């Protein structure tokens, strides 16, 4: 018996047009792969430039990279703890940098210059597939962290302080990736749509404040995602966090 008088396939819900790559029976969003690798390539190039001639008196790209490293290190240490944060620092740093570069790249890079057969390039984090994939990756990291350090005792936290908490703890595990993915996706997509509408209606001065606000929001969203990822991992590692 159907609960609704219509069907609503989630896979058919889209915003805008997309370039698809057909691999067997699987449809891949081609423009997301393209924009992701362009941004990853730009990030790697910046890192290579910043670490080419290391100096004790850092300047330019090296100075910025060292600032980011110190910031991510402090964030990871605060959320995960002094004992375990070093082994998770590359993971948290990669998440933060990819999201930050993706968010800012979607706002600053003139993607429309690159023409595609269908659809257009944009911020990878404005696509729900990207944010859900990263949220699930954080969830897997959370379970791996807990099981690798505590073994099966990890699941004791689901019945602490009382077994009555079990259903609530299970629901919480589903809400974690949902909140991570939809918060990031919704904010970045809304920013892109707002800027796009304003540029179309008032193409000169008015969109600039909104674009600047979008850059600030994009940086905050990267920070929130990385902080929550580190917190969840720390929660899985410690008896009480």
UniProtKB/Swiss-Prot annotation:
Source organism superkingdom: Bacteria
Topology class, membrane: Multi-pass membrane protein
Residues that span the membrane, as ranges: 30-50, 89-109, 128-148, 193-213, 214-234
Keyword terms: ATP synthesis, CF(0), Hydrogen ion transport, Ion transport, Membrane, Thylakoid, Transmembrane, Transmembrane helix, Transport
Subcellular localization, as worded in the UniProt entry: Cellular thylakoid membrane
Entry's Gene Ontology cellular component terms: plasma membrane-derived thylakoid membrane; proton-transporting ATP synthase complex
Keyword Membrane: yes
Molecular function per GO: proton-transporting ATP synthase activity, rotational mechanism
Pfam family, one: ATP-synt_A
InterPro entries per the UniProt record, alphabetical: ATP_syn_F0_a_bact/chloroplast, ATP_synth_F0_asu, ATP_synth_F0_asu_AS, F0_ATP_A_sf
Gene3D superfamilies linked to this entry: ATP synthase, F0 complex, subunit A
Assembly with partners or alone: F-type ATPases have 2 components, CF(1) - the catalytic core - and CF(0) - the membrane proton channel. CF(1) has five subunits: alpha(3), beta(3), gamma(1), delta(1), epsilon(1). CF(0) has four main subunits: a, b, b' and c.
Stated family: Belongs to the ATPase A chain family.
Described function: Key component of the proton channel; it plays a direct role in the translocation of protons across the membrane.
Protein name as annotated: ATP synthase subunit a
Natural source organism: Synechococcus sp. (strain CC9311)
């Amino acid at each position: 018996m159907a609960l609704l008088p219509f069907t609503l396939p989630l896979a058919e819900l889209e915003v805008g047009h997309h370039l698809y790559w057909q691999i067997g029976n699987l449809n891949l969003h081609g423009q997301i792969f393209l924009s992701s690798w362009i941004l990853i390539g730009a990030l790697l190039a910046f890192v290579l430039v910043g670490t080419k001639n290391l100096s004790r008196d850092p300047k330019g790209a090296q100075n910025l990279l060292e600032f980011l490293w110190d910031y991510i290190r402090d964030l990871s240490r605060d959320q995960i703890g002094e004992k375990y944060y070093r082994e998770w620092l590359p993971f948290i740093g990669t998440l933060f940098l990819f999201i930050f570069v993706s968010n800012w790249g979607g706002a600053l890079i003139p993607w429309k210059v690159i023409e595609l057969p269908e659809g257009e390039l944009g911020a990878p984090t404005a696509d729900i597939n990207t944010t859900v994939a990263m949220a699930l990756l954080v969830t897997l990291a959370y379970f791996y962290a807990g099981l690798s350090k505590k073994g099966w005792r990890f699941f004791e936290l689901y019945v602490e302080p009382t077994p009555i908490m079990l259903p609530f703890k299970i629901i919480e595990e589903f809400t974690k990736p949902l909140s991570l993915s939809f918060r990031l996706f919704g904010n970045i997509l809304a920013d892109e749509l707002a800027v796009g509408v304003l540029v179309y209606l008032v193409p000169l001065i008015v969109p600039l404040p909104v674009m600047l606000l979008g850059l600030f929001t994009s940086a905050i969203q990267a920070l929130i995602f990385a902080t929550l990822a580190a917190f969840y991992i720390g929660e899985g590692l410690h008896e009480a966090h």
